[in-house]
Each structure stands twice: as C-alpha cells, then as structure tokens.
C-alpha cells in the first residue's frame, strides 16, 4: 500500500510540473497573439490603401485592354500553392486542417506531380509534403513570431515571378484565417491572376477619370500589380501567424485544464488509498490487541 501511495504522489507531482509548463506556454502564446493581432490591424491600413488604389485603377478605362499577365487568365496546365503551416507543434489541429485541405485539393484536381507546385512556408508542411514525395518548389522555415516583410519577401516575390514566367498558370494561398482566439477557418484564396475586385473598394467619387498615366500604363501596372499581390500574400501570412498563436494558446489552456483534472482525480485516489491504509492499520492493531486478551 505504501508503494501505491508513493506512486500516486509521484504522479501528482509530475502532473503539477507539467501543468506549470503548459500554463507558462499559454501565457507566452497569449502575449504573442496580442502582438500579432495588433500587427494585423496595423497592416490593414496599408493593405486597404493599396487595394483601394488598385481597384480604382482597374475599374477605370485607363487600363482596359491591358495584356498584363497578372490580369489575364490563360489555360491552366499547372497550379501553384503557397501553403502556410507552423514550424513547431503544440498548436492543436492548426496544421492538420491545412494539410488535409491541401491533400483533398491535390487529390481532387491533380493526377500528376507536374500538375502543381507547392511553395511551403513552415517546417511542418515542408516535412509533410517531402515525406510523401510531393512537388515542393521552394520552402521557408523558421518564420518569426511576428514575421517582417524582409523575411518573407523573397519567397513571395519568387512565387509571383514563377507565375509571370508561366511556370504555373494560377496561384493560390492555403492558410488558416484567424477569426477569434477560439476559431480559425481554412482559406484557399486565389491570388493570381487577379480577379474582379470588390466594387465597394472604389466609390463613384474616387474612380480615376480624366487622367493620364506617366510614363505609361504598362509600366505602372508592372510596378503596382506585383506589389498589390505581394501585399495580399504577406497579409495572409500575418493572418495565419495570428491563427497559429491563438491555436497554441487554446491548446495549452486545454492541456492545463486537463492536467488540473488529472491532479484532482489523483488527489482523490491518493486520499482514498491513504484512508484505506489507515483503516487497515487500525484493524490490524485492534486484531492484535484482541489476540493478547
């Protein structure tokens, strides 16, 4: 019985240590989430402005008839996917949702590896796809908690350049969209070619009319459209990172709560075992006393 009590006590102490670790990780993820949410809000100021400029320009008659490849659809022979996962685990179902969505998409729409190209951001996704012999063209590992454009700009530019060079004919970003601290949604968002933009982004009094573009429209579009697309992709990365921190916080909170429940159950088990041991000792003492009479 003493050995059993000792084992239960050791389990309680071990679980308490685990609970302290998961609680600390929860607080760290919570702090990261607050920073990421603020970064997302700050970026939206820039994203909204460039989206408005691009929308106004494309809805004007200044660019009608442009043959810019970023605006023109072509027969789809190959599709590019930017897939955003985490670099580490302990984030609940964050990665599994993305990887399942990608596998379903590839199974449904592609029969050969040459039909698609994956640009992987995050070690979990890179390892997953490579282990299955899938077509990973580029990868980025070790993404910062609050990624700067300098860190991700190169791989984003590579993706846009691959489309412009017709290495694939359309480009999607697959990521977890942050809804709130408890919820995220998988998004498969088309980036290229640029589709019809939201009419609400351009009001009647803002649509460009009666202006000339200098030096010419093609030069303007050549500069603006990649910048616009890259900003959308960067925004998706920030959004995904925010969802990752939220998932990490929720996972660690769940782990902490589960540890507390285990501790409570073990404590009850320990007290019952201790009570049984005491009762057994009293019974033995009484029996011994009776034997001496």
Swiss-Prot record:
One of its GO terms (cellular component) is proton-transporting ATP synthase complex. InterPro entries: ATP_synth_F1_ATPase_gsu, ATP_synth_F1_gsu, ATP_synth_F1_gsu_CS. This is ATP synthase gamma chain. It comes from Streptococcus agalactiae serotype V (strain ATCC BAA-611 / 2603 V/R). The gene is atpG. GO terms for biological process: proton motive force-driven plasma membrane ATP synthesis. Keywords: ATP synthesis, Cell membrane, CF(1), Hydrogen ion transport, Ion transport, Membrane, Transport. The keyword Ion transport applies. The lineage of its organism: Bacteria, Bacillati, Bacillota, Bacilli, Lactobacillales. Its main location: membrane. The keyword Cell membrane applies. Belongs to the ATPase gamma chain family. F-type ATPases have 2 components, CF(1) - the catalytic core - and CF(0) - the membrane proton channel. CF(1) has five subunits: alpha(3), beta(3), gamma(1), delta(1), epsilon(1). CF(0) has three main subunits: a, b and c.
């Amino acid at each position: 019985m003493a050995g059993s009590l000792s084992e239960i006590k050791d389990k309680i102490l071990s679980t308490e240590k685990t609970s302290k670790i998961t609680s600390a990780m929860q607080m760290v993820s919570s702090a990261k989430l607050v920073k990421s949410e603020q970064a997302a809000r700050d970026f939206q100021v820039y994203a909204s402005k460039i989206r408005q400029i691009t929308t106004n320009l494309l809805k004007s008659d200044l660019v009608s008839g442009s043959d810019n490849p970023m605006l023109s659809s072509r027969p789809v022979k190959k599709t590019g996917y930017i897939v955003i996962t985490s670099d580490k685990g302990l984030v609940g179902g964050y990665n599994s949702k993305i990887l399942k969505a990608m596998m379903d998409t590839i199974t449904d729409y592609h029969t050969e590896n040459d039909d698609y190209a994956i640009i992987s951001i995050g070690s979990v996704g890179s390892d997953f796809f490579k282990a299955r012999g899938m077509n990973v063209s580029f990868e980025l590992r070790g993404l910062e908690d609050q990624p700067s454009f300098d860190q991700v700009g190169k791989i984003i530019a590579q993706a846009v350049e691959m489309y412009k060079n017709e290495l694939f004919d359309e480009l999607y970003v697959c990521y977890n969209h942050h809804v709130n601290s408890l919820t995220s949604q998988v998004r498969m968002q088309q980036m290229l070619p640029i589709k019809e933009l939201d009419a609400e982004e351009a009001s009647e009094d803002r649509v460009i009319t009666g202006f000339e573009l200098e030096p010419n429209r093609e030069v303007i579009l050549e500069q603006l459209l990649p910048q616009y697309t890259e900003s959308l992709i960067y925004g998706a990365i920030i959004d995904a990172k925010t969802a990752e921190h939220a998932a990490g916080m929720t996972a660690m909170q769940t782990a902490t709560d589960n540890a507390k429940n285990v501790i409570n159950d073990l404590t009850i088990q320990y007290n019952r075992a201790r009570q049984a041991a005491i009762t057994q000792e009293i019974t033995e003492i009484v029996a011994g006393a009776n034997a001496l009479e």
